[in-house]
């Protein structure tokens, strides 16, 4: 179902977000 897929994707999205945060900060002037 959509709910189970969303629950599986949520922790992955959080990991990607944490990984992207320092990259985004470094990219900013």
UniProtKB/Swiss-Prot annotation:
A GO cellular component term found in this entry reads: extracellular region
Task: Say if the entry is tagged with keyword Mitochondrion.
Answer: no
Q: Which GO terms describe its biological process?
A: defense response to bacterium; innate immune response; killing of cells of another organism
Q: Where in the cell is it found?
A: Secreted
Grouped into one coarse class, the protein's main location is secreted
Temperature-related activity notes? Thermostable. Still active at 100 degrees Celsius.
**Where is the secretion signal located?**
none
Q: Which cysteines are joined by disulfide bonds?
A: none
Q: Supply the alphabetized keyword list.
A: Antibiotic, Antimicrobial, Cytolysis, Hemolysis, Immunity, Innate immunity, Secreted
Assembly and interactions? Homomer of four to six subunits.
Q: What is the protein's known function?
A: Female-specific peptides with potent activity against Gram-positive and Gram-negative bacteria. They have as well hemolytic activity.
The name on file for this protein is Ceratotoxin-B
Q: Which gene encodes it?
A: CTXB
């Amino acid at each position: 179902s959509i709910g189970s897929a969303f629950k599986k994707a949520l922790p992955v999205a959080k990991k990607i977000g944490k990984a992207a945060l320092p990259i985004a900060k470094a990219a900013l002037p």
